[in-house]
């Protein structure tokens, strides 16, 4: 049933879904078609306040607004299709990019805003480096039913070319009043490594000009069975990307400041055992030479394959049973494997209620 729902969220091929409920039918209409580039440009050309609603100002400063006040959305949609992420359902698997002229117009407008000090905090989207990279076949016929764009590796029909984003960032940086343009959105390192023509040039440009000390990437895990359950690529791409990143950071010229990789990790995802977290810690120590700090305990989000696996204990694509850690203390313990013993916590009455242990 879930696969029927998920496949039916492609706007180009979707039809109405009907489910009988008592004497009536529940009807889910197909999603709207993706916005055209012209429509997306028109939406972003509107004069937004770039501030919190006046109602919330009475409660004092809102710190979160400062991270996005001077940022630019370059595109929407994501074809990464990580099993734990609902963006593919919310925004669609078709990436729609704004025109260069629209983005440059917004960047120029930002320079005129009160409080702007020359720094554009982010130019990106759900995945920063999907800008202007989309499959022409998918635009016409919709997403493939039994094939993903990036998993287990990039599809040959995906025209990987980071050139347009390189040019865009350079042009924004050249606008009078702009001191620095940052890319703070996450980057798919597998796309960088699969772009044989401009991938390394893109990485060099980002490291040299567009990150403020840390580049965010999301390997999420390292063991094959957990990565498979997540719909994430293997560690080969990660190791190659890290090596290229390190080469740039070992450059002794003044062009490069010392930069670091920030790794996002998920603990207690369906299929992940305590031993898997120990293996991940060892991988991070030996291969990444770091202890990741951005670790979160898996949260099952609606409309995702990972939530389906969490609640059913069944691997979504094979129908086989899969281990799911539901004990709240043990879930936190998986996170603590990476972060250290200070992050272990004692159980509270809210964890178990009247039960001694939650049942799987």
Language-model segments: what does each one mean?
Residues 43, 134-163, 229-230, 234-236, ...:
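Radical SAM enzyme [4Fe-4S]-AdoMet core and its adjacent flexible, acidic
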Residues 57-86, 104, 119:
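N-terminal pre-triad scaffold of radical SAM enzymes
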Residues 1-68, 349, 355, 359:
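Flexible, acidic/Gly-rich N-terminal and inter-domain linker regions that tether
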Residues 109-262, 267-270:
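Conserved SAM/AdoMet-binding glycine-rich loop
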Residues 269-286:
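Catalytic cores of alpha/beta
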Residues 97-98, 344-355:
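Structured C-terminal cap/extension of enzyme domains
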